[in-house]
Amino acid sequence: MNSTKFLCASILALAVSLSLLLTLSIVDQVHAAKYPYKGQLSGQNEVPPVETSATGEAEFTVPANGSMKYRVNITGLSNATAAHIHSGAEGQNGDIVVDLLNTPTSKSKDTAYGMIFRGNFSDSSLKGPMQGKTIDDLAAAMDSGETYVNVHTTEHPDGEVRGQLSNVDKAAAGSTNSTNATVGFSTLTE
């Protein structure tokens, strides 16, 4: 009798544990972005490259509401004069498509190591070759590797750090080593 109770309790505990794991996985997937994009920023990515110790990471997501949410974290500089998404393939300069420091919700703050800025924008914030288009059009350009983030400073008015944007999910799907594909990805939080 006791062994039957123990077996039932063990099965119940296992079922609850599995249910909890599945629930957390589903919740994580529900909260996952429609398109997670990321770019690693450095002076070596500038065209032409610039000497700087500054580096950074830019992250973009498309929540269900049709806007694009972003977070840019930079170390080694705190004096950004401008930050944009530009159109252009790797190694090419292109037109500004979004001004990241002047969106209606943009916030920036200096940190002990650099600066962070974040916010979100909608179709109406798109300019240049994206003017009149949608966030989904911008996401398609990001998917094809045709966009980059550029952060400008007084010392480097054409850009101090730059990073090509890519779809993290597509990169992970194309990777044979899923551990390497997901290392360093962080979720945007306000």
Mark where each language-model region is:
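Metal-centered catalytic cores of metalloenzymes
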Residues: 22-83, 87-190
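N-terminal secretory signal peptides that target proteins for export/translocation
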Residues: 1-6
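Bacterial N-terminal signal peptides
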Residues: 10-25
